[in-house]
Amino acid sequence: MAAKIRRNDEVIVLVGKDKGKKGKVTKVLETGKVIVEGINLVKKHQKPVPALGQQGGIVEKEAAIDASNIAIYNEATGKADRIGFRFEEGKKVRFFKSNGETIK
């Protein structure tokens, strides 16, 4: 099955503490989760690793969020949108369901 959400897609969070925030997908995990830039920030207590020259402390980083809790953001409508697939010139492409516009 083709991935509806891909890396570098502009998405909007539908539920949770970051509801309504927009960000760019940095990584799509095989477990059905995605990592979005600036969304779902958590504080990790990092141990120092002198061999690598890493300092210890509290580091803020992005945690994975389930793909069902985000939707692709349609710039034309300014809203969250659904994705469909169709064939154009022998290639499978993604499109916005609301206005039929091809994604990228």
UniProtKB/Swiss-Prot annotation:
Q: Which GO terms describe its cellular component?
A: ribonucleoprotein complex; ribosome
**Stretches that traverse the bilayer:** none
Keyword Nuclease applies:
no
Q: Which InterPro entries match?
A: KOW, Rib_uL2_dom2, Ribosomal_uL24, Ribosomal_uL24_CS, Ribosomal_uL24_KOW, Translation_prot_SH3-like_sf
List, alphabetically, the Pfam families matched: KOW, ribosomal_L24
Q: Which GO terms describe its biological process?
A: translation
Q: Which keywords describe this protein according to UniProt?
A: Ribonucleoprotein, Ribosomal protein, RNA-binding, rRNA-binding
A molecular function GO annotation? structural constituent of ribosome
**Task of the protein:** One of two assembly initiator proteins, it binds directly to the 5'-end of the 23S rRNA, where it nucleates assembly of the 50S subunit. One of the proteins that surrounds the polypeptide exit tunnel on the outside of the subunit.
Tell me the subunit arrangement. Part of the 50S ribosomal subunit.
Q: Which family does it belong to?
A: Belongs to the universal ribosomal protein uL24 family.
PANTHER family xrefs = MITOCHONDRIAL RIBOSOMAL PROTEIN L24 (PTHR12903)
HAMAP family given in the database record = Ribosomal_uL24_B
Q: What is this protein called?
A: Large ribosomal subunit protein uL24
